[in-house]
Amino acid sequence: MLLLHYFNLSHFQVNDHFYPHMRNFLYGETAFYVADTINMMFYIWVLFSAQQFHFNFTLVSGTQYVIHFFDNLAIIVMRLHSLLGFTDDFDIGSNVVFNGAMTFSVYCIVAAMCSLPFSILERCFATRYLKDYEANSRAYISYALVFLLNFIGIIGAILLQNKNNTIFVVAFLMILNLFALLTNQFLRTWNLKKYEECHSNVSIRFQRGGKYSLAKRFQISENIKSLHMLNFIILYMGFMNVCLVISVLFSSFDISPERQAICSLALDASIFFYSFAIPQIMTCFCHKWKVQTNTFRIRIGCLRTGKVNLEPLRDTFGGDMRGSVSMNRYFDQLQDSWENA
């Protein structure tokens, strides 16, 4: 069985005088997991209440947050089970609660590693159905993606019951994320091309007919914004994903308890950084998220209501934009759409 988030406390208690410090470290780490769980609960609320994104993108992204939330709960159960002396480190297979929590955590890790590629896959559908994707949500797309994401997580958890399968699961996850990176670049290039076409006086039609209506222009702009955010997340979090995958891979080897502890520490650090950083990155790109977080901070007294922070207008690419330019561009688009209707 693949052992993740595992510290052999019995070994350190017998062979290492740093055992008291390790127990204190694990108690502190458990407190961090509790804080991270509260953080996940808050941003799950922000994600669904702010309604920044299309329903399908919100549901797929929300699944990632929910997975992190339940993964934290599973790890907290594992930590308390071990720290309170219920775990038999000499016969780890006999611990039903501990093994159940670890298996669930393995499912969460595999599913979480698939969530970003599935978010990009949802943008493929948004690009395919430019004409009416905003008006016709096609909720079955997100339902199917969430089902497939969880199915892959379950299959991964089953396969990793035999740690000899770890290399195959890791290879699949790395290839999937590499494919997602390439797909994201392709979608960005394609949407940028269409964006330039729909703002050009020369070409105002798709090659196969049909006009660049306001709905299509809006969807193209939304695709560019979300893909830019996803690209930033992929590049920024790529190093953490590599650390996470490597720690999982090394945990599958027959290594000493000390090295197992190092792998678990690297895995935990990657998850902490991942779960704390992604909401912050998304907040930087999402105006409604900033409004929701500031409103909450005002309610709890962490932000004064007297100070008003003016948010500059942003164009499709996230740059500052003067109000007059923004208004003129909007009416130019409206006039072009009216003339070509």
UniProtKB/Swiss-Prot annotation:
Gene Ontology cellular component list: membrane
Topology term for the membrane: Multi-pass membrane protein
Keyword Transmembrane in annotation: yes
Keyword terms: Membrane, Transmembrane, Transmembrane helix
GO BP of this protein: sensory perception of chemical stimulus
Pfam families cross-referenced by the UniProt entry: Sre
Residue stretches spanning the membrane: 30-50, 57-77, 101-121, 140-160, 167-187, 230-250, 262-282
Subcellular location: Membrane
Xref: InterPro entries: 7TM_GPCR_serpentine_rcpt_Sre (IPR004151), Serpentine_rcpt_epsilon (IPR052854)
PANTHER family membership: SERPENTINE RECEPTOR CLASS EPSILON-13-RELATED, SERPENTINE RECEPTOR, CLASS E (EPSILON)-RELATED
Family stated for the protein in its record: Belongs to the nematode receptor-like protein sre family.
Protein name per the record: Serpentine receptor class epsilon-12
Encoding gene per record: sre-12
